[in-house]
């Protein structure tokens, strides 16, 4: 009997050790960000141009005939136990020529998960903004729904951000870092998928690699022209008003 209990104890120890070693603490994730251009451009024209409905219909028919439906771009998220760094896979990434909103096309987001400090680099037309503030706080509601993303079992969570915008996120609790793409964070594990249905935006992991990380930093952190998030939003609002671009989707996408 003593040998039986010893054997069971050893098996449990091995099992717990295997489970413990399966947790990922640092690595690199490749994300695909997709924007439905057909919907975004149609809403842009409706909100900013004042075209009659028939003209909008004809315009969009021509646009759809000559443009791909989705704008897809690729970003890498590097992470360890205390930091996440999200930036374009291609540092020379450009926005599509057939898309009217040259904003947020090569965002960079560095989050310090210990101090809850965030440093972001964002684009609006030909201007780049450098923003330093606390990380976004999101009130998530966890669900029981599960799905596989890039080989990881992920649990669904829902939230409202910017007062009324519905967000669906999927997180993997076997990746211990509580980060995610863009400024999304705050779930019990790494966020591998984000869907924003009303804004027609998705961000999903394509590959996840475990690897050791050196210190995660951005060279732009040393700049002096750094804004708070509130000041950044105020400047964006003023810029869009000057161009008569009171477009709600654009405001959200710039600050996402």
Regions inferred by a protein language model and the residue ranges of each:
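Bacterial Sec-dependent N-terminal signal peptides
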Residues: 1-24, 256
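Extended soluble regions of mature proteins
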Residues: 20-256
């Amino acid at each position: 009997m003593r040998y039986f209990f010893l054997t069971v104890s050893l098996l449990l120890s091995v099992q717990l050790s295997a489970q413990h070693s399966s947790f990922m603490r640092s690595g690199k994730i490749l994300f695909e960000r997709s924007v439905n251009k057909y919907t975004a451009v149609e809403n842009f024209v409706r909100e900013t141009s004042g075209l009659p409905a028939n003209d909008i219909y004809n315009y969009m028919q021509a646009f759809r005939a000559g443009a791909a439906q989705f704008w897809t771009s690729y970003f890498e998220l590097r992470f360890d136990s205390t930091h996440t760094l999200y930036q374009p896979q291609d540092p020379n990434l450009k926005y599509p020529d057939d898309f009217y909103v040259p904003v947020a096309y090569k965002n960079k987001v560095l989050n310090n998960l210990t101090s809850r400090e965030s440093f972001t680099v964002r684009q609006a037309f030909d201007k780049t903004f450098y923003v330093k503030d606390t990380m976004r706080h999101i009130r998530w509601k966890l669900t029981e729904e599960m799905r596989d993303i890039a080989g990881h079992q992920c649990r669904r969570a829902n939230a409202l951000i910017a007062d009324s915008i519905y967000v669906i996120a999927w997180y993997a609790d076997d990746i211990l870092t509580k980060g995610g793409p863009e400024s999304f964070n705050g779930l019990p594990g790494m966020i591998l998928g984000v869907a924003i249905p009303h804004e027609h935006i998705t961000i999903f992991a394509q590959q996840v690699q475990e690897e050791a990380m050196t210190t995660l930093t951005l060279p732009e952190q040393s700049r002096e022209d750094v804004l708070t998030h509130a000041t950044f939003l105020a400047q964006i609002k003023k810029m869009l008003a000057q161009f008569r671009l009171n477009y709600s989707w654009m405001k959200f996408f710039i600050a996402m």
